[in-house]
């Protein structure tokens, strides 16, 4: 669909996500979300206050509509531009910034740890905590859901080792 062929009435009736699709299809390039929002607002003649009220709706619609693909760093493209096999490879992921923290040394050198390593440590700590809780439960002598009667066999008297049918 061409932008010039649309009447003002058709543009007003069109949803924001449809307008975003038309803008991206005609420009044939990925857009930053806020740039796309401005293009859609310009196209539909939406005021800035109305645009601020609708920003979350457009973002939600882009996420739900299967025609759009997030490329990382708040950049959106059309899924049809990327073959299925290449889509995962070409999507850019922003580099996570390294976090700085002071080491305990007096020489003032700084250590740099990547965010991934910190997240991995947090998961290991959580895993250790869960293991400790499980061990405590295992060591706990009481089993709330266990009753010695559960082990008794029906029709068998444990005291003399005879079945109840044999007693005469």
Swiss-Prot record:
Keywords: DNA-directed RNA polymerase, Nucleotidyltransferase, Transcription, Transferase. It holds the Pfam family HARE-HTH. Residues 106-168 have a biased composition (Acidic residues). Signal peptide: none annotated. InterPro entries: Asxl_HARE-HTH (IPR007759), RNAP_delta_N_dom_sf (IPR038087), RpoE (IPR029757). RNAP is composed of a core of 2 alpha, a beta and a beta' subunits. The core is associated with a delta subunit and one of several sigma factors. This is Probable DNA-directed RNA polymerase subunit delta. It comes from Shouchella clausii (strain KSM-K16) (Alkalihalobacillus clausii). The gene is rpoE.
